[in-house]
Amino acid sequence: MNLFVALFINASLSFILISVAFWLPQLNIYTEKASPYECGFDPLSSARLPFSMKFFLVAITFLLFDLEIALLLPLPWAIQITKLSAMMITSFILISILALGLIYEWMNKGLEWTE
């Protein structure tokens, strides 16, 4: 019975909060609130501006390195396993790949912004 009451209270409170969050912003609609903020320039102008290829390459490089680091995040919890040497070898391989990728990008001047 207590579980049913708790579930009912949680569901009703959630429904009330969601409905208030949905209906409250619609009471006061302003043009500043309705338009997106785009760092000081007019967001309603043409979106077909030239895109810097250097920025794209740096962004892709960041994503690749970020994914490799995300592979290293569970390794502190892997210390609790019995095969510590396998975890150390895996982490060394991942860090080596990360370092080799950084060296490759650095040698090919992929990290230099101005040219």
Curated annotation (Swiss-Prot):
EC number of the protein: 7.1.1.2
Localization in the cell: Mitochondrion inner membrane
Domain of life where this protein originates: Eukaryota
Recorded GO MF terms: NADH dehydrogenase (ubiquinone) activity
Enzyme class: translocase
One GO BP annotation of this record: mitochondrial electron transport, NADH to ubiquinone
GO CC annotation terms, alphabetical: mitochondrial inner membrane; NADH dehydrogenase complex
Membrane spanning residue stretches: 3-23, 55-75, 84-104
InterPro entries from the UniProt entry: NADH_UbQ/plastoQ_OxRdtase_su3, NDAH_ubi_oxred_su3_sf
Reaction catalysed by this enzyme: a ubiquinone + NADH + 5 H(+)(in) = a ubiquinol + NAD(+) + 4 H(+)(out)
Main localization, broad class: mitochondrion
Membrane topology annotation: Multi-pass membrane protein
Keyword NAD: yes
Keyword tags: Electron transport, Membrane, Mitochondrion, Mitochondrion inner membrane, NAD, Respiratory chain, Translocase, Transmembrane, Transmembrane helix, Transport, Ubiquinone
Family listed: Belongs to the complex I subunit 3 family.
Subunit organization: Core subunit of respiratory chain NADH dehydrogenase (Complex I) which is composed of 45 different subunits. Interacts with TMEM186. Interacts with TMEM242.
Function: Core subunit of the mitochondrial membrane respiratory chain NADH dehydrogenase (Complex I) which catalyzes electron transfer from NADH through the respiratory chain, using ubiquinone as an electron acceptor. Essential for the catalytic activity of complex I.
Protein name: NADH-ubiquinone oxidoreductase chain 3
Species: Sigmodon hispidus
Originating gene: MT-ND3
